[in-house]
């Protein structure tokens, strides 16, 4: 069974960061080692919260502890999400390097949380660090539309421009870019677009967009987690993308139908594993 070290925020109540990522990856048959960068009572969109961030040095100490018992060599991938400070971002880089030195076959998937995540904003300097340092280290990245624009340093209004932006990042290091939410001026307003791009291929997929009174937090974290888990299980890029598109839709639909604010992960767990409704991806902008 594959193992992933997941470095993200955590909420006790609800689903954001590792609280949105761990269970879906486990349900897909992947062992998850959660390292929580922030521990909060709930995500901050509620307007009240309690909690704090973990010290960056302790992040490295925790991973050193795993190495000390000889288990780090079994880590197959690292997934990073919210990094609250430049010190945490630097610690994450050192952790990834340690994992890759211990297991040269391990890979790193970066969800570059640069904006508000569950109401949390990273400290000044985190965005600049992510843009400057992480593409060279990452094997894959999962930005949303705004994060893609920041990483590529360009405005994006069409799918063709998004593919071009992804390729510019790929030239810096990653093998693939998963765009978790793509705004395309040519797409219907009731569709949610996702895109995945490699050096030579690109696929786009659409799912229904639901009109929530308050949009649930953690959908992006869920998206990255499912994609990573399917890749660890051996899916091709396209197969992992299509499964992710379908499984995330199932969770979002279950949440909408139940009129809930928090993601219905447990209720939709069978759909995460085996979605009943699929949305095929089609080739776009391929060389």
From Swiss-Prot:
Binding-site list for substrate: 9, 44-45, 221
The reaction(s) this protein catalyses: pyridoxal + ATP = pyridoxal 5'-phosphate + ADP + H(+)
GO molecular function, one term: magnesium ion binding
Family: Belongs to the pyridoxine kinase family. PdxY subfamily.
Associated pathway: Cofactor metabolism; pyridoxal 5'-phosphate salvage; pyridoxal 5'-phosphate from pyridoxal: step 1/1
Keyword Nucleotide-binding included in the entry's annotation: yes
InterPro entries: PM/HMP-P_kinase-1, PyrdxlKinase, Pyridoxal_kinase_PdxY, Ribokinase-like
NCBIfam families on file: PRK05756.1, pyridox_kin
Organism: Burkholderia thailandensis (strain ATCC 700388 / DSM 13276 / CCUG 48851 / CIP 106301 / E264)
EC code: 2.7.1.35
Cofactor: Mg(2+)
Name this polypeptide is given: Pyridoxal kinase PdxY
Record-linked PANTHER family: PYRIDOXAL KINASE
A cellular component term, taken from the record's GO annotations: cytosol
UniProt function note: Pyridoxal kinase involved in the salvage pathway of pyridoxal 5'-phosphate (PLP). Catalyzes the phosphorylation of pyridoxal to PLP.
Oligomer and partners: Homodimer.
Domain of life: Bacteria
Range of residues in the leader sequence: none
Gene Ontology terms: biological process: pyridoxal 5'-phosphate salvage
Chain sites annotated for binding ATP: 111, 142, 147, 180
SUPFAM superfamilies linked: Ribokinase-like
Keywords assigned by UniProt, alphabetized: ATP-binding, Kinase, Magnesium, Nucleotide-binding, Transferase
């Amino acid at each position: 069974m594959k193992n992933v070290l997941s470095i993200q925020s955590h909420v006790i109540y609800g689903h954001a960061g590792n609280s949105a990522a761990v269970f879906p990856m486990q349900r897909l048959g992947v062992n998850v080692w959660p390292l929580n960068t922030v521990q909060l009572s709930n995500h901050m969109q509620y307007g009240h919260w309690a909690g704090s961030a973990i010290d960056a040095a302790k992040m490295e100490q925790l991973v050193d502890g795993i190495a000390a018992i000889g288990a780090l060599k079994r880590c197959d991938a690292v997934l990073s999400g919210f990094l609250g400070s430049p010190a945490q971002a630097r610690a994450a880089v050192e952790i990834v390097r340690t994992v890759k030195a211990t297991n040269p076959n391990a890979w790193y998937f970066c969800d570059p949380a640069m904006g508000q995540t569950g109401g949390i904003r990273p400290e000044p300097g985190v965005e600049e660090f992510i843009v400057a340092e992480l593409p060279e280290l990452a094997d894959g990245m999962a930005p949303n539309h705004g994060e893609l624009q920041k990483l590529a340093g360009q405005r994006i209004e069409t799918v063709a421009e998004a593919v071009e932006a992804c390729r510019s990042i790929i030239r810096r290091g990653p093998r693939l870019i998963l765009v978790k939410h793509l705004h395309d001026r040519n797409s219907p307003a009731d569709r949610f677009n996702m895109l995945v791009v490699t050096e030579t291929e690109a696929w786009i997929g659409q799912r229904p967009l639901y009109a929530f009174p308050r949009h649930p937090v953690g959908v992006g974290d869920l998206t990255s987690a499912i994609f990573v888990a399917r890749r660890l299980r051996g899916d091709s890029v396209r197969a992992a993308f299509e499964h992710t598109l379908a499984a995330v839709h199932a969770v979002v639909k279950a949440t909408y139908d139940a009129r809930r604010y928090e993601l219905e992960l447990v209720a939709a767990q069978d759909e995460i594993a085996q979605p009943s409704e699929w949305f095929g991806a089609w080739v776009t902008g391929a060389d």
